[in-house]
Amino acid sequence: MRVMHLTCDVAIIGGAFSGAATALLLKRRNPALHVVIIEKSEAFDRKVGESTTEVSSCFLTRVLGLTNYLGHHQLAKQGLRMWFARSEDEKFDECAELGARFNSRMPGFQVDRATLDKHVLALAVAAGCELIRPAKVVKFELGGAGSSLLELIEGGESRQVLARWIVDASGRAAIIARKRGYMQAMPEHPVNSLWARFTGVADWDSIALREKFPKWAAATVAARGWATNHLCGPGWWVWIIPLKGGDVSVGLVYDERLFTPPEGTGIGARILAHCREHPIGREILADAKVIEGDERAFSQLTYRVTQVMCDGWACVGDAAGFIDPLYSPGLDFCSFTAQSVANAVADACAGKCVDIRDYNRRFAFCFQSWFDCIYRDKYFYIGDAEIMAAALLMDVATYHLGPVKQVYSDPATMFGAFPFDGFAGRVAAKFIAFYNRRLVAIARKRIAAGTYGARNAKWRLLIPGFTHEPKQSGRLLFSGIRRWLWMEIKSLWLRKKPSQPAEAVVKNPADAETERAATK
């Protein structure tokens, strides 16, 4: 076998979004850098991470400059919506709904990741990056800046790449973190997922549904079908995301402590079986058919990486850790890490000092804070519409007052600063983590009392819209706080129901006891 040698400034393992974005930012910062991208696949396949947030949309449009591409080749996202029911027999138009009254006031997109990744990689190559594809990294040696070595197999031939810096953008494969023992599971958040793409999904905004459920259709002027719709239940939630061309992504995420998905022979069939037990899913997915071969399952979704940068290497995107798909934070982390690592590597290649210890400390604090604030034990209350209404208002308002306001204030530089950086960020983290703990405590009381999900029908919370303007988001934040404090007061009178174990309510909130509580 002939061995070919290549020397470069930066070698990036993985050419999907995080790797390609990092490469593109490096070339924009210093066009003279020799950047090599190593991608194992011949063509990208579809992956999750299809829904953007206001933060990742800012990165896509104002940092990468993809506004025109996204407008022509992807879908505009119209916020998120959550649907709840007291039982599977609930009427479709009586399910509790949380969402927007109007279309989104800030940019957001529903993206086919295969085509988005392909486009960003093409931009990186056009900017002067060298692409080696398909090629598999079979071995690496991290010798510090200037002396790290990658061994590849490309087309049956062996190649060696000597790089000043290596960037791991290999996603969940997390090549460096796994090899070095830096990857850790997070048993405190045992969430798993099943997902697939479907055809034949009903149009949320169709004339047929409008005629069948006129009051439901008239309740909002927003386009429900372009939102990320969530079916919510105790210990689980389902995303329903439309994609360009008509396919629809549907995924089930669940906490294995609280919920067990249906058994079955196929992932898509199991997802449909579960969704059709929810009144909304039964209507919207009545004629849905799974796209063969386009279905996946992951256990232990959540993991952390204890060191994400060292002398001569760094991790970006999912190679640096992953928390949870709820609220679509994946591309946010990709955006912050791509910009931060590109800044650090460009500085190092220019002979500037990079504070690696500080970077690892700030990233670890951001990652842990994001988990504690938003996700720790959230699946205990995700199936209760009243609790989630307060959580949604506070979560999204603080998100807009914090990260969204941060990046829109100066997109060119603020993606280099992690959320929760600084004194104000730390204070905000303590507050958000506190109210999350209190909502969990309220949910546990309701579970024990048999009243969990009692208000999951016959009302809706329709929000005028979120922006990063303090007045608007502040008003919604205080609305969420009022709801939270009122639930705290009501929970003082809740008493555990001795005849029914708490687990029964969590596993099946639609039993007779819960239904009786819901009708009082």
Language model: regions and residue ranges:
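C-terminal helical "tail/cap" subdomain of flavin- and related membrane-associated enzymes
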Residues: 343-515
